[in-house]
């Protein structure tokens, strides 16, 4: 059963694959040939066989199949791909084919490599693919054109292959390998390949598939079906290929492995097997099967990945063997991608099968070939894919050559200079045969040549012996000058003939028709108005038989189909349906005619004419026939019959008319008899088989003979004197013969320009004859300009239709004062008025000095026989040259003063302008110090300042020191031309002195009869010395302020070393240190007891420049008075600390005292602790981490010991205690042991600078130090952002941190373009380094780090010269081509100019319309894209020696904006001697409304061209334009073109589909603009006009808007309907609804009828403008129509039932009816009748509160109410403290706020704001008491903001319906009383509130976090007014929120998301 199920799945999947699209597999490889730019491409593709053939057995190895176009890369052309079939698989319906071609790429400059991307792409992939279905395939490879390396070292691409369809098992592990070979076999170091999924074009890789870098694929497909994959294969030199193939996933039932817990259980996939040993493996299945597939036998079969060498010239064979172990089964081997020429034999079949391949490669086959094999058994099971490489190695000597003494000896005609790989001169092709004669040209020789003669300029013919450029007098006989022969039944297809007066010049033609015929196109034109549905049914059912009958005549026949209708009331002349190559039997099966009638307007002949005129996808080189099936004769006029005949002749189409049931076809018989071609057959009309058989007979009739006709509409028809007689086509053998009888004669007196005669061999093809005869030449007008006081050169040009050599003669000359024109000999042409000048003559025009007027001269052309009929004009324009302005520098420096205006002016002069302007280059250098204005506006780098006008600079910035700023400026004239030199003005920005600030400690205390010191302090940032002045002094009764000469207070007041301080005493010369100057003074007293405010002293300080500070006062208080007993000190026990670290334990100096006033623990301890002897090797500090030295202090006196840096050992200090009477205790000492520790190392990082020209920076070494002598190891923690940093080994630092082995580093700038923010500029950057030691100490810690140290690096950018590279400009003959010089500059790539050193020899350079002269190029530089090249008339690449070109070249350099010049290089001009393709289709198409139109665009190859490609440039876009892909029997697939231009290549006929937009029509409806191109040669712009023909359509209706009436709560404006058609109105109001209808039909002339269904609730009225409420008549079941208003709209008024409301209250349907009775779709308005939402309000009992800081303030009785909020819905409030006059929220550092109840509230983290969300009762309880506590005094307001969240509004508009209110309570906090008050508290508070303004938005965020838990967020609620506005905001109920539609689901109250 399992096996049967497996076979069913396998067969089903194969069936699906067979019925799919056609692409299966593809890969492209390449290799250079005899030179670096000639590349040989080898492509392998696989397709579905039945897409190209009628059955899988019809294909044969060696068949040629055209599969598309290979594009060689952007701008270098393409080639049609015709693969040679190499393998095919009958069972799986695919074949593989190989295509080889050679492409010569444009030459590269020496030392350069250019990469192109070759691509083979088309649509569409298989529709049933599980990934990438219906997508385009893109097979690409990167092609390297390498002119840098020797040819032997030039890269070859990889090569790969695969079976087109690889079978895999679903839900199981599938492992296979993609094999590829690196073709660089001539190199000793063959590069490795890497594999990955392709990302060249976007595609989806199979889910569950991976690939490693070696090409091993692992795939566990989870679905049964087809997958596509593309593998990317890259070699080490950057060349890649892809291999694209299909994976077919099939089911394979099995049982679980014995190691599984459910062993033996039936399974279909690995995941169904549980607990297995190999679970999760990517290579071993746990669901196994005993149904084993076949496998290859090795040997003889090559192993996967093997390489087999096939020597050149030797026959080599390989055998493949496959076997199965399953009894009763046989095996077969399928190969893929065999090289062309390999023969295959299969001598053995059965359980074991063998296949042998044999091949004898030639030198042309050099390279690698990846061949793939798969083995399948008779049940459909397949082996894994086996792939190997066939290597044809390139020998030392090719093509039979041999080596003798190290030199190649060649046989036959091979060239030893190429080691026998290239032909000798004069030989061509793979066999090096002799080239045919080539008289005046160069033969296309070489191994890749075709032997054709490439003629030199002026010669033509097969051997280039016929002159095509000569004087007319040299031609005396008629001759055939050019003949083109394309693949066709009739040859030649194009002929060029020169006719003289000799009559009846004969042009021979050849016919070659195979039997059976190989190309047949049949277009079926069906009458869609037959007599009955039964009759049309016969046509449908017989179409398949007809197709089969025709395919019996030609197996590859293609079909198209279209329709016409002869229904008299509404006939249709022609409507195309399917283009050529379509399944017409299926198409007609879906077609439904609109009418069946026996009446006819007889338009079948007109329909046939239109069908022949249309582009229906005819294939080039096919026999073309239109089969017209109709049941009525035509009734056309004679003019229409003539038009029919001419159209069929012009298109070489033959008609076959099938009379379907008609008694006679008299008119058709007559028309075809008169025409002389075509066939009429009669069918019964009652049988499908009869008409199909008769139609087949008609086609055979027209195939049986060749009827020649001359197209009378061709311009050269009058030149045809006779055509050949009818030729009979053999029915049993091929017909090949030369046909005579085509004769031409020159009509007398003809003036036809470029006549072309068309001779049609009806159906089989046609010959176009371009006829030349001597006609007058045409002189070509031109113009040029020359700069004032300069000169210009020019040539005279003209054209001759016969390519005769031209001469020219002047007919008018310059006026006397205009200047002089001289010839190349310097002679004035006005003195030689009868001279003829050659076309190569160069004339020079020199205008007289300062002559500026325009002038013209005239001339005629002469071809040797006649002059041109009209003269041509040369227009001369003299360009006035603008003189640059000049500016003047300001010599004196402008000195500025702070906050003072400085006014100055600048001057400039200009030759043309009286008042030029001036502009500053960089005014920001000055505006950094103040304001810089002109006429009141700030000056920028674009400000234009009139010369002499004043500008003002006001210094507002006080620099630390005086600064000098120099500004550059330039003059600019009215043409925006700048002065060549810059000028300057300098400013001295002066520093302004700042007054000092005085300070001191106050009050200070002193004991009775004691002394105390105090310090006078002055602070100043810009002075060096201070002067202190005593401004007031109060000594007390027994006190004195004094100083000691020892600068301390150790002296006694009144002693010789003391000085008493008096009023106005001064202390001068006090130095500032760290901005502070200190003066120590002393105070002593003789008082016996304590006295408060006993003494005081006031002082100021003055700086160096005399600025005086504020006045500071110091108050002295006297404390203490008693009897005393000496205290006792307490000893501190010895202790230890760590080296260099403060002791972590506090130590205390204290003692005891018998005096209770001094010592009474725990309440009194007035002892003073004194350090009598400080430690010798350390210090004592009072705070553990502080710096204050512990000398004395109140006992207990806490101190910490800090050893001196680096000290270790023992130390000691002594101490005692002193009581308040200065009695001291004895002295005690304590010993401290300092234990050694590890020290942190130090690091110094020096700044470094370098430039862009210094390359890599010099190595920098870090400066490190370790106190302990440890090693210091450093690492980079952060590298510079813009500079590359390298480690000690000079390796780029890419990961951080990075160790520096020798503590050194260096820098290098990799890419100056990435400097940010300004590329190519100088900048500073930083980096961070940290170091650590390697200490062995561990206590108290081990290894220590320096921490992060920042270093700085300065990069200076130095401008570099630009660079250039030669370019090749390609253009068409006789055209002008703009081009762009190739220049690059890393600093300013967009600001380069070109400098030209010489003019082209064979053409002109144009700057606009000005022809460049040697004078111009000597003085000017040009924008890179400013110039165009125009070759001289008639010249092209053919005029060069090798006929390849280029025609011209010029040397040039580029100059950057700094004037640096690049090295010179060359622009070459390659002029193509070809004509573009020509569009042959209709310019206008008629498309039925709402109907797809198959648009086929056909073109003809231009004379001398090779391709017809199309580029759709523009589409007007009202409809849809798509590319139509023919999928064979599957019909067509349309892919919309979404961007333009859109290009297609590889055919002469391109299929599109046009679809008009729904219900739109009209003439000139859409426009399609396109060009045809051949390579990069483009045709003129073609435009197809699309007319969309009207088909009657129903009307449409549109609801416009509504307006609520009777509602006074809001502005009742007009509201536009959205797509929901919802009306929102309030209770007890009415609404006016406005709507309209439209009809696309032009016959709808009366207003549409509006019908409205009666409302189920409420009342509907018509609108009556005469009554106030607008309510007209009631609309009920008897009155449902609404008349159109005078403004063109329709109106109804709706009123709901009074006092009722609700969502979706009522639905009102509307529809329209046209005057034909068609109804529009119905639109329904949904009425929501809503309740009113009442705004909340705020109440406050007391609106003013005041208190002092640091006291809590309770605000009571602040409440709010929302009338329509209930007990359950939430309301939002925000309680905050704001400023007195603004809405800025105060900071928590200034004021704090709290509520009585904080549940469901959130306090802001930094601002005085609380956000709450709860019911209104709960919130009112919360705010019953609001507590406010201010730190900073000031006037505040308590603000309560309430939002009702719109809960009373309907949910649909709740987001827009929030109502809110705001209330305030004033709160004032006075400053608590203090001894001093130096600042205005209000000022401080204002600053504090202003500083908190930025936090206001954060309060909104806090409210949002609460609110979003229970309410939908809206922008109305969270607008700025919600938090900052005063009072109740305006009602937002009817304001549309911009984000109203973005309403998220409510979140639960537990949501804590921020």
Curated annotation (Swiss-Prot):
GO terms for biological process, alphabetical: cell adhesion; phagocytosis
Subcellular location per the Swiss-Prot or TrEMBL entry: Membrane
Topology relative to the membrane: Single-pass type I membrane protein
Glycan-bearing residues: 138, 354, 479, 1348, 1382, 1628, 1678, 1742, 1770, 1820, 1860, 1881
Membrane-spanning residues: 1884-1904
GO cellular component: a single term: membrane
Signal peptide start-end: 1-20
Residue pairs linked by disulfide bridges in the UniProt entry: 438-453, 455-464
Primary location recorded for the protein, binned into one broad class: membrane
Occurrences of domain VWFA (ranges): 521-706
Domain EGF-like intervals: 428-465
Pfam hit, one: Ig_SIBA-E_3rd
Sequence ranges on the Cytoplasmic membrane side: 1905-1954
Topological domains, Extracellular: 21-1883
InterPro entries: EGF-like_dom, Ig_SibA-E, Ig_SibA-E_2nd, Ig_SibA-E_3rd, SibA-E_N, VWF_A, vWFA_dom_sf
Keyword Glycoprotein: yes
Keywords linked to the UniProt accession: Cell adhesion, Disulfide bond, EGF-like domain, Glycoprotein, Membrane, Signal, Transmembrane, Transmembrane helix
Subunit structure: Interacts with talA/talin.
UniProt record similarity statement: Belongs to the SIB family.
The protein's role, per its UniProt record: Implicated in cellular adhesion.
PANTHER family linked: INTEGRIN BETA-LIKE PROTEIN E, STABILIN
Protein name, as recorded: Integrin beta-like protein C
Organism of provenance: Dictyostelium discoideum
